[in-house]
Amino acid sequence: MSDLKTTKDTLVSTLFELSKAAQDAANAAIEFYKVASGGSDHVSAEQLKAVSEALNTVATLSSGNGAKIEATESKKKRKQEKDPNAPKKPLTMFFQFSYDLRKKIGIERKKKDLPSLSAIDMNSMIKDRWDSISEAEKAGYKKRYDDAMIIYNIEKKKYEESLKDGSAYYPPPSVQTPIVGHGIEQDFDDDATDIVSSPEEPKKKKKKTEKKEKKKKSGHGSP
């Protein structure tokens, strides 16, 4: 903390020195314009504009920029102080549904030795499925979310108390258990599984053909 304060004070001091140097440069510019114009005290509008812009730059460096730097340091400090053990909010209904469906599709495609779907295809399938699920299925996801929020609020209170009294806090493994919902189990096989299983049919036929050919060869080879 002391190092941060020292470096900040050094930065502020440097900015003030820069401000003073810029002011001196502006005054020197005015004197230069006077000499260049033959010693006349008259300064043109363009010259005054150039000096004004220089002074505005000084003001920005000495005040606004310092405030921005301090705000940036404060923001970085808040990010660094975020505790990874702090309880995390549960997934919303849609994101929990998305998690479940992604897991279901991944399992089905892995069983069939199929490559993963592209992000576009996966997101499109998830959106279509979410738009078509029944109110009862959505109610099931809402209940899961509400139950998870109850646990989250309890854990959040425990965590805040541990910060006050200095006691240890041990977060639960997961506030929201990522299990596949009943709605996906019931309806997924009717439509999405067709996408998963259809490319597999040629493989099955090929395996049967290979077995028949092996039997024929073994039959010819026997006396």
From Swiss-Prot:
Q: What induces it?
A: Repressed hyphae and in biofilm.
GO biological process assignments: chromatin remodeling; DNA topological change; filamentous growth of a population of unicellular organisms; negative regulation of G1/S transition of mitotic cell cycle; nucleophagy; positive regulation of double-strand break repair via nonhomologous end joining; rDNA chromatin condensation; regulation of ribosomal protein gene transcription by RNA polymerase II
Q: Give GO terms: molecular function aspect only.
A: DNA binding, bending; double-stranded DNA binding; four-way junction DNA binding; sequence-specific DNA binding
Purpose of the protein: Transcription factor that binds upstream of hexose and ergosterol metabolism, as well as cell cycle genes. Activates pseudohyphal growth.
Region of interest (Disordered), ranges:
69-89, 165-223
Its subcellular locations are:
Nucleus
Q: Which residues bind DNA?
A: 87-160
Keyword check for Transcription regulation, yes or no: yes
- InterPro entries per the record? HMG_box_dom, HMG_box_dom_sf, HMGB
- The portions of this protein that span the membrane are none
Q: What is the protein name given in its UniProt record?
A: Transcriptional regulator HMO1
Keyword Manganese attributed: no
Spell out the GO cellular component terms annotated for this protein, sorted alphabetically and separated by semicolons.
Answer: cytosol; nucleolus; rDNA heterochromatin; small-subunit processome
User: Compositionally biased, Basic residues: which spans?
Assistant: 204-223
